[in-house]
């Protein structure tokens, strides 16, 4: 099928691609999507099936399980994890800035100072609210 543009140029639809040169990327993407699916299907087909009650037990490093698997734990773990994630993400954002510091100039330095100041205020707030104290 042949189309004609407003400029009079004829384009053959069978050879027209939106992103020419990305064939290798598309192939890689398809393979990357197929490998985990293939691994899961292969596992499902080849894995031994055991109907014993031992299979349903919670694994505790080779020891006999004691009690149930559903236990309560202190909610403060979430607060520590949240504070850790916040400051971990901070380092992820600051690392590229530090690598390119000499090329970015004064404006980027001021922006980084504002970013660090906001995070320090958040840390002070969490500290003041007792989020970092274990009792």
Curated annotation (Swiss-Prot):
Pfam families: Oxidored_q4. It catalyses: a plastoquinone + NADH + (n+1) H(+)(in) = a plastoquinol + NAD(+) + n H(+)(out); a plastoquinone + NADPH + (n+1) H(+)(in) = a plastoquinol + NADP(+) + n H(+)(out). One of its GO terms (cellular component) is NADH dehydrogenase complex. One of its GO terms (molecular function) is quinone binding. NDH-1 can be composed of about 15 different subunits; different subcomplexes with different compositions have been identified which probably have different functions. Belongs to the complex I subunit 3 family. This is NAD(P)H-quinone oxidoreductase subunit 3.
